[in-house]
Amino acid sequence: MTQVHMTTGHAAAIAIDGADKVYPDGTHALQPVHLSIRQGEFVTLLGPSGCGKSTLLKMIAGLLPVDQGSIRVDGQPAGSPQKSDQSLAFVFQSPTLMPWATVQANVRLPLELQGVPSGEIGPRVEEALRLVGLQQFAQHLPNALSGGMQMRVSIARAFVTDPSLLLMDEPFGALDEITRHKLDGELLDIWRQRQITVVFVTHSIHEAVFLSSRVVMMAARPGRIVDELTIAEPYPRTQEFMVTPEFNVYARHLQHSLFRASEAQADAELS
């Protein structure tokens, strides 16, 4: 199989300039964050619980306001009414499917909410289900599907709007290891086909190295970026990549970064 390096555009799909978040109870969730993500990158936010990964992702989506600084998505403020909802999709930790509706109806919903003409909806839903291998399950209810298949429905629902930016908050964290590895590979295949920008949140160092073109390491109390690592390995990536010396070098680097950040946090709490 021919291996290629993914090319990314020079324009910033996401520009984060000093973004800060303090919750009403005074918790400093994020200290000022500076980060630029190029069009077509697959960037993973990695770190322990409480480091602000999900908070930052929701701020990029416009689901949480920025207290100070700014976040711009395709040149527009995050959450701006000028920003087309169609250009951004969010996949949550759980599939959040309507249990009374079929797989097909769940995937149709975003297009119906956007007012897409009914004649266009059917082919787009069919293509989204084909993308995740669920064409034969279109008329099934979610509770008849496994956890991995339900997450595939959630991914199809995200891609049916043809987004340019996909935000994913630990989508495979609750799945068994075999299913997680399979979905990681399928996600990379879709990303390479669509050439979109992905920001992915995980606790898993191995998942981050396998998926990413760049890993952003975060630490907690307050949430902040402590390291960035480019994964300069070609795509497509198979499971064999995970047992190579190169993979282990990347993983050890991130493990050491996480350990140093944890030590610094412990020292700060004792002082």
Locate the predicted segments by residue.
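Short hydrophobic beta-strand elements within the C-terminal catalytic ATPase subdomain
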Residues: V73, M217-M218
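Non-catalytic connector elements of ABC transporters
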Residues: T2-Q3, E240-S271
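A generic structural motif
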Residues: V22, M218-A219
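Conserved beta-strand-loop-alpha-helix hinge in the C-terminal portion
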Residues: A220-V249
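Short, glycine/charged-rich "phosphate-handling" switch motifs in NTP-dependent
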Residues: R214
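A general structural signal marking secondary-structure boundaries and capping sites
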Residues: D67, P163, A219, E233, ...
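ABC family nucleotide-binding domain
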Residues: H5-H206, L211
